[in-house]
């Protein structure tokens, strides 16, 4: 299986990237082909809502999403979203990637991809992952992704760890 790991932490050595490294190592040991993409450091601009793509065409923005990431998404069997939780939600960089799914929503929904979520948070209260989980499940449902599971790591306690 081809797996695309979307990493979105600004901290290259933080807990979310440690989770990503462990996932990649395990997947490769099982014979899967894994590609990692650093969403945080890529030039990915937000959707401008111009609707020129019509949910099926190329995006008018010629950034790393349109020229690199979109092709990787199309080629993969599974997307793995890796992120620290920021204020009880998804980081802007990863949310921007999902917003840009709009440019090929129809095509992407018929690809029936698999998805997983690996996330960490400073906080370890009962509510820290509520919004994150709800959004992930909604995206899986809407995009017809098969939910392969989540790893939710709370209580990381320092910015260096997330």
Named regions from a protein language model:
Residues 1, 24, 29, 138-162:
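Glycine-rich phosphate/pyrophosphate-binding loop and the adjoining helix
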Residues 42-43, 123, 156-157:
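Short, internal active-site loops enriched in acidic
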Residues 92-93, 106-149:
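Short, glycine-/small-residue-rich phosphate/pyrophosphate-handling segment
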